[in-house]
Every structure is written in structure tokens, then in C-alpha cells.
Design a protein with these regions (language model features):
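C-terminal functional extensions of proteins
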Residues: 33-81, 88-119, 124-193
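Metabolite-binding pocket within alpha/beta catalytic cores that recognizes anionic/polar moieties
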Residues: 1-56
Length: 193
């Protein structure tokens, strides 16, 4: 995001919530991100974050109110990268920007993918399948050039990446690996690490 390689982000309430939890408390579901030590009552941290974001009124205002200076959502806000957060029936909260109506969420996602030239889906099965099903295989640029849209799915579970292929997204390239390793290798390849 910081280096301009992300033009849009599509995710669920969980990615944004846990990213903001990590930014604010340095925990993920109450465990320290780096040491994995549990914090006392840390399992409430994500709920505390949701309530603070809701009190602030938006993710951007929360970032300003609490001087958040790291994380995916921080980088999206700082760099004006649009994001679409869609909800699930089992979401905590959710955060203010989360679209709870499935059809409105799909419409917002379609609006983002129709502008894409490359789509990379990272370790979220339901969003990956939804995105794959709505991503066109080509795009016509303003000058009339027809350009393919590249679609990659990355997950440590081959069942997840193959599920998209099983549903007819034949243009998808699947990569079975740990997402963190994938991101680090790509970042090194781009020379940004």
C-alpha cells in the first residue's frame, strides 16, 4: 500500500478490525503479535477497537483520534486507497464502513474489480470466491486497447484456492503458500524491502 502497488482493497469486517487492533494494542485476538503472549482480558481488544471506531464515526476519524500510525487500514486512509468492507452474519460490531447488505456489498465490489488490471486474493475463501466470480477476464482501456485482467489466489490450503477454479474462474492462477511468505517474496522482488 505504502509503495503504490494497491489501488483498492476489498475485505470483510475482520481484516479491518484485527488490523486496527494490531495497530492500537499490538495484539491479534488478545495475543501479542510478536511474542504470542496473551494479554489479560486481551480477547476483548477487538471489541474495544470496534466500539472506539464506532464512537469516532469512521475508520479515518478513529485513526486521527487515536494517532494510529501503522497497519493496512492506516495505509489505505493515508494514501487515499479506496476500500470496500463487506459484512457477514457473524460479524462483531461491525465497523461503520462495513456494508451489511450483501447485494450492496457485491455492487461496491463489482465497481472496484471492473477497474482492476490485476487482482490478488489473499487467504479469505469467501471473498476470494466472490471476487473471482465477479472479476472480468479482460478490460477495455480508454484508448480501446483490450487488456487481460490477471487474477491470483494465495492461500496455505489448496482446497481454498482450488474452490475458485471449481466454480468456473478458469483465468485464476492459484498459489498454495503462506500469505506472509508470499507478501515478503513479492516485496523483495519489487525491491521495496
Amino acid at each position: 500500500v505504502e509503495h503504490g502497488y494497491v489501488a483498492g482493497l476489498m475485505a470483510g469486517n475482520a481484516l479491518a478490525t484485527h488490523d486496527l487492533e494490531g495497530s492500537m494494542f499490538h495484539t491479534a485476538l488478545g495475543q501479542d503479535i510478536y511474542t504470542q503472549k496473551s494479554h489479560p482480558n486481551g480477547h476483548y481488544n477487538h471489541l474495544d477497537v470496534i466500539n472506539r471506531v464506532r464512537r469516532s464515526g469512521s475508520i479515518a476519524q478513529f485513526i486521527e483520534d487515536y494517532n494510529i500510525d501503522n497497519g493496512i487500514m492506516y495505509s489505505c486512509v493515508k494514501n487515499n486507497v479506496p476500500f470496500v468492507l463487506t459484512g457477514s452474519i457473524r460479524d462483531d460490531g461491525p465497523l461503520p464502513e462495513v456494508i451489511g447488505d450483501a447485494y450492496a456489498g457485491q455492487t461496491a465490489m463489482r465497481g472496484m474489480v471492473k477497474k482492476a488490471t490485476t487482482v490478488i486474493c489473499l487467504a479469505t475463501m469467501l471473498h476470494t470466491i466472490a471476487t473471482g466470480n465477479m472479476t472480468p477476464s479482460y478490460r477495455v482501456l480508454e484508448d480501446g486497447t483490450v487488456r487481460p485482467v490477471f487474477l491470483y489466489t494465495v492461500d496455505a490450503d489448496e482446497f481454498v484456492v482450488n474452490k475458485l477454479l471449481d466454480r468456473g474462474s478458469l483465468a485464476a492462477t492459484t498459489i498454495v503458500t503462506n500469505v506472509q511468505d508470499f507478501i515478503m517474496i513479492v516485496a523483495k522482488g519489487l525491491g521495496i524491502l
